[in-house]
Amino acid sequence: MELPLLDKLKVRDLVDKRFSHLFETVSLLSGDNEEDNEDQLRLKNSIKNLREHLTEKEEEIRQLHDVISVKNRDAERLNDELISINIENNLLQERLTHIQAEYDTLIERWLLKAQREADIMNTRLK
């Protein structure tokens, strides 16, 4: 139980480290130039866009994990259904085999009885 939690914490720390590394504050030269201000604005917009993109992707990942979870549950249910149907099929197959054997025995007995009756009729006619 502790290992999955530890693994998740390690993954979270790694993601947090990468996130911090990606979005480190860019030290910009402080200047009154219009170009510097435009560059700063562009960089801030770029960082904002990247953060929004990251948030969208994280949400997409969460949704995909949910879809995978649902599909795994469905696959598990389907597997359980297949197992139960297999068991039922095996039981029915055994029952069919037993009934066929019983049927064959009855037919054999009936044929013997019919043969005896035919033999009796033949002996009476002679």
Curated annotation (Swiss-Prot):
GO terms for biological process: autophagy; protein transport. Pfam families: ATG16 (PF08614). One of its GO terms (cellular component) is phagophore assembly site membrane. It comes from the Eukaryota. It is a peripheral membrane protein. Residues 32-109 form a coiled coil. InterPro entries: Autophagy-rel_prot_16_dom. Keywords: Autophagy, Coiled coil, Membrane, Protein transport, Transport. Disulfide bonds: none annotated. It is found in: Preautophagosomal structure membrane. Homodimer. Part of the ATG5-ATG12/ATG16 complex. Several units of each may be present in this complex. Belongs to the ATG16 family. Stabilizes the ATG5-ATG12 conjugate which is necessary for autophagy. The ATG5-ATG12/ATG16 complex is required for efficient promotion of ATG8-conjugation to phosphatidylethanolamine and ATG8 localization to the pre-autophagosomal structure (PAS). Also recruits ATG3 to the PAS. Involved in endoplasmic reticulum-specific autophagic process and is essential for the survival of cells subjected to severe ER stress. This is Autophagy protein 16. It comes from Kluyveromyces lactis (strain ATCC 8585 / CBS 2359 / DSM 70799 / NBRC 1267 / NRRL Y-1140 / WM37). The gene is ATG16.
